[in-house]
Each structure stands twice: as structure tokens, then as C-alpha cells.
């Protein structure tokens, strides 16, 4: 049997956020973002594409309304290190648009990193796996205090049949410090 093309979609949540939200990361979240490039590279190799929601989208956080930059700030260091652009064409609630985009033939043999908001990311992963008759019962809900999980969807494009499988991994970055990095500070 001929092996199909495999598309690997690696989904991460943004880094830690302040109590009031502010659309932003905490220093611990920034430290996570700075550590992510090497973690993701070691686990999945260099991606072909990176996605994050449109940072112009406004979100209501406990501290008020803010532009939602957390996912982009989280994946930005990886994009810089890998020399890749970040596709921000979709708002954080537009998981249908994201799913339609990532199921286009251009992505069939690619590794794609997606940084997003965890509730919508959970919905996206479930919808994507279900669309290829995959088993969604094995997909856990993404917990509110979980910044470390990696949800991975592998779409295998075979002869006449496309399937999707889910697996869960972890960044292993929960023990990072909560002080902001200060390069060059005495």
C-alpha cells in the first residue's frame, strides 16, 4: 500500500497571561515564547508555515478591551528564528476559516505551527479531526491553566481516503522563571 502525504498541524496555546488579561503576556509567558523555538524544532522540525490570529481583533479581558496579541507574541520568536512569516489572516474566533485554509492541497505534506486561544483551539482541533472521521473522544478539553500542552493533528492524504489522528505532547516549559529577560542589564 502506498504511503500518503502527511500534514502535521502543531497547535500551541499562547503563553501565560496577566490576571487582567490586557491582551498581553506576562514575563513568564515571554520566557515561554523565547524558549519555544528550540522545543518545537526538536520535537517537530522546522515548519513550512506558521499561523496566529489577527492581532487587530479586539478581545474583552477582565481589564477591558484590548487587541489580542498573545498568540502572535508567543509564536513570534519561533517565526524569527526559523525565518518564516506568520499568517494572521484569521480572527481568533474564525476557526472555520482556519480549518478551510489548512485543508487546502498546498499544505498536504507540510508541518504547520498554529498558536491560538485555547478554547477556540480546542474547538478547531475537534472540528478538524471530526471532518476526516477521526476519533474526537480521545481529545481532552484544554484546561484554563494549561499553557504547556501541544495538540497535534496528523492528516494523512492517501489514495482515495484522507484520515486525521490526534496526539498530545507537552512543551515541558512550566518551570520557567517569572522575571522578564533583560539582555545587557548589569
Which sequence ranges carry the predicted segments?
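Periplasmic-binding protein-like
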Residues: 111-115
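Active-site-proximal alpha-helix that buttresses catalytic centers in soluble enzyme cores
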Residues: 1-109, 120-186
